[in-house]
């Protein structure tokens, strides 16, 4: 099995990877419009045969494990550091009842993290000593690409959401190095993306369609000098896509510039969950919702199918436990694992119940597990932001 690599940078396959997939030749590949292209594996006779294109799979595909990250810095979380660690431990414990969980933690904090997290559920929790700054591994961790018999990790060049010099800035140097260290640990080839972004900005149906907000990707704080068409081509070539459905989003009002994973999500090909702001939500977010609803109502996916959109009402901002401008009261930031969907509950009993019912209808073969994550949400993120899945390698035909 081979994976595409940036021009002039042919990685050395680790022993782990060779044991897992067998010896292979790793050719260099120019980025341009061809990343990733068909992987090539040498046959016993030495002839080369083309393998399917690597692409970003749907999150609903089967996982090998879930990655998370241990909150590291009081300079980021202040007096909420203990509370947010409790939330991370709660989420990790719940997910570990359905699939293995690996939590990266600074070497000096790993022992405390192991004690705090405990053994987890039936699939277990493992603490891996990799330096990090914060918990948002969806954004700074690898975005995985798969094909039959092949897997690679896309490094999306995390730059702290482009917030240097703004009130939203926080340290990110360690986070920016996590993808490389994590992929090395698991023997997965790393591919550098021809754009800058985050995993939370990318939502795919696994069949060639991507949902994305222009505010978070066509933005000079990530991709200066790139037009929307240029960003779209970079996304298509690096994620194995054929269609990008652009939503305007809203820049400058949160640290992510309105990531898609808090706004609209695929529950299946052709089916989208749309976040509907609850009572008390700022008018600017209601306008984003209306614009998004209008675009999705007229959109088709990569296979020409119109989208079926189900609205997921948010809670009443006056009825929830969490407060503050940055508190993310979005049920749409759920996470799908093997056999389960993990979604916040905010204390608005009626809205929490409605979210449960809508997600159970959308995922009838999965358990819907609701969790208290108020400390995480107070930092502007949710369960999806705090997790990243490693998909199972599809079998060869």
Question: What residues fall within each predicted segment?
Answer:
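Basic, Lys/Arg-rich alpha-helical nucleic-acid-recognition elements, primarily the DNA-binding modules
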Residues: 20
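The feature marks the mature, well-folded catalytic cores of soluble enzymes
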Residues: 46-397
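N-terminal secretory signal peptides
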Residues: 1-14, 24-31, 37-38
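Sec-dependent signal peptide cleavage junction
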Residues: 36-47
């Amino acid at each position: 099995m081979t994976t595409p690599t940036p021009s002039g940078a042919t990685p050395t396959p680790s022993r782990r990877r060779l044991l897992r997939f067998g010896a292979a030749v790793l050719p260099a590949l120019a980025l341009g419009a061809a990343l990733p292209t068909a992987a090539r594996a040498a046959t016993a006779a030495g002839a080369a045969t083309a393998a399917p294109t690597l692409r970003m799979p749907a999150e609903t595909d089967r996982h090998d494990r879930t990655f998370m990250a241990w909150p590291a810095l009081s300079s980021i979380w202040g007096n909420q550091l203990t509370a947010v660690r409790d939330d991370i431990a709660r989420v990790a414990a719940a997910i570990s009842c359905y699939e293995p969980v690996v939590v990266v933690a600074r070497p000096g904090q790993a022992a405390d993290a192991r004690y705090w997290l405990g053994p987890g559920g039936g699939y277990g929790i493992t603490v891996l000593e990799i330096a990090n700054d914060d918990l948002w591994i969806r954004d700074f961790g690898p975005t995985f690409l798969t094909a039959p018999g092949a897997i690679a990790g896309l490094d999306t060049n995390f730059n702290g959401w482009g917030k240097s010099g703004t009130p939203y800035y926080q340290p990110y140097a360690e986070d920016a190095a996590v993808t490389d260290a994590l992929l090395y640990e698991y023997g997965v080839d790393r591919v550098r993306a021809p754009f800058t972004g985050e995993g939370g900005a990318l939502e795919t149906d696994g069949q060639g369609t991507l949902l994305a907000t222009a505010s978070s990707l066509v933005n000079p704080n990530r991709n200066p000098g790139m037009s929307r068409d240029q960003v779209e081509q970079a996304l298509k070539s690096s994620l194995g896509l054929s269609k990008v459905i652009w939503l305007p989003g809203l820049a400058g009002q949160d640290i992510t510039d309105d990531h898609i994973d808090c706004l609209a999500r695929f529950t299946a090909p052709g089916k989208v969950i749309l976040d509907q702001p609850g009572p008390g939500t700022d008018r600017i977010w209601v306008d984003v919702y209306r614009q998004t609803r209008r675009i999705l109502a007229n959109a088709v996916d990569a296979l020409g199918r119109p989208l079926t959109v189900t609205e997921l009402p948010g809670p009443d901002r006056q009825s929830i436990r969490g407060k503050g401008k940055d508190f993310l009261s979005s049920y749409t930031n759920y996470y799908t694992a093997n056999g389960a969907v993990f979604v916040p509950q905010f204390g608005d009993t009626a809205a929490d119940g409605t979210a449960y019912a809508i997600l159970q209808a959308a995922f009838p073969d999965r358990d819907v597990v609701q969790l208290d994550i108020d400390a995480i949400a107070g930092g502007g993120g949710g369960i999806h932001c705090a997790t990243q899945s490693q998909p199972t390698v599809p079998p060869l035909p």
